[in-house]
């Protein structure tokens, strides 16, 4: 079912409609909420939602063989629709960060009204997934973000597929994001981050789509007559396990590695060349073995900027339960 959960009049054109798509089987025991497009440049997440909407419509119409709806699934594909339509991270009308507006205010500014609608429609779910990508100028290998997960959240994370989970930075900004509002409401939830902003990677989305469907099977809101949900190994990394590679000079950063690769201590991440002469002026090296989870994508860098984030290997890092 397609539903407009908020419509905001615009003086310059048609109203801004916040859409929610939902499917319901019987009996309804669990609800899973999936949210994408909190920023306008989260193209992978918005496309992934559209892929999921098409699939679930086919399941509901009994076109997709072997799948049966047994619970409630709701998808909000484009939270920051005005920014998405402009091709920007933030909407130029107010230039407010949507993910710093939660839990929102239904009588507040436009961003606060949107945040309030999203939160009210998802807060009573049993499971939640937020689709995200790397910050501007960076690219993320697929990974999960979760804070102090209990055993149920850990099992939920294992159903999604990415091999690594990270701990979010505990900052004032975290308290204002949708994910933190969910966790404070004791809603088992994760952030799934992959790819880079303003870029659509369809092959990556297909891989992530398979994991999303598997997670729906694990929660029980979706059933397949021929197969059960898979359980993937997940390596949990706290903040102390993250190792950064910094630029030793400013210039053009020419990368030599790709996100998602295993890096050896002393391995060259790339080269920084002088923007005028092309002379190599720095060769950043990894300071430890690790999984390359985030890599600088924009080539112009300044001295001491972060070029890469590695997740250092640990002896006991897989969740034991």
Which functions belong to the PLM regions below?
Residues 1-321:
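Structured catalytic-domain cores with a bias toward divalent-metal coordination
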């Amino acid at each position: 079912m397609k539903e407009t959960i908020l419509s905001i009049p615009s003086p310059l054109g048609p109203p801004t409609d916040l859409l929610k798509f939902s499917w319901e089987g019987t009996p309804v025991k669990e609800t899973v909420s999936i949210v994408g497009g909190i920023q306008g440049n989260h193209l992978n997440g918005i496309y992934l939602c559209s892929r999921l909407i098409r699939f679930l419509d086919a399941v509901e119409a009994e076109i997709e063989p072997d799948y049966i709806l047994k619970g409630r699934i709701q998808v909000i594909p484009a939270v920051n629709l005005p920014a998405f339509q402009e091709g920007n991270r933030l909407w130029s009308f107010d230039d407010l960060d949507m993910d710093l507006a939660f839990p929102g205010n239904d009588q507040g500014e436009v961003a606060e009204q949107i945040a309030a609608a999203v939160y009210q429609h998802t807060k009573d779910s049993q499971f939640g997934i937020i689709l995200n990508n790397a910050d501007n100028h960076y690219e993320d290998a697929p990974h999960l973000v979760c804070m102090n997960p209990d055993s149920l959240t850990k099992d939920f994370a294992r159903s999604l597929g990415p091999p690594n989970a990270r701990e979010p930075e505990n900052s004032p900004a975290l308290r204002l994001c949708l994910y933190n509002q969910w966790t404070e409401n004791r809603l088992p939830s994760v952030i799934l981050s992959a790819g880079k902003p303003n870029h659509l990677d369809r092959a990556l989305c297909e891989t992530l789509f398979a994991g999303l469907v598997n997670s729906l099977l694990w929660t029980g809101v979706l059933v397949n007559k021929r197969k059960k949900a898979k359980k993937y190994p997940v390596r949990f990394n706290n903040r102390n396990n993250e190792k950064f590679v910094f630029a030793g000079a400013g210039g053009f950063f020419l990368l030599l590695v790709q996100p998602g690769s295993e890096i050896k201590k002393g391995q060259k991440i790339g080269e920084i060349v002088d923007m005028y002469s092309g002379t190599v002026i720095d060769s950043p090296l990894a300071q430890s073995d690790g999984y390359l989870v985030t890599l600088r994508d924009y080539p112009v860098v300044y001295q001491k900027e972060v070029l890469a984030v590695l997740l250092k290997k640990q002896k006991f890092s897989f969740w034991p339960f």
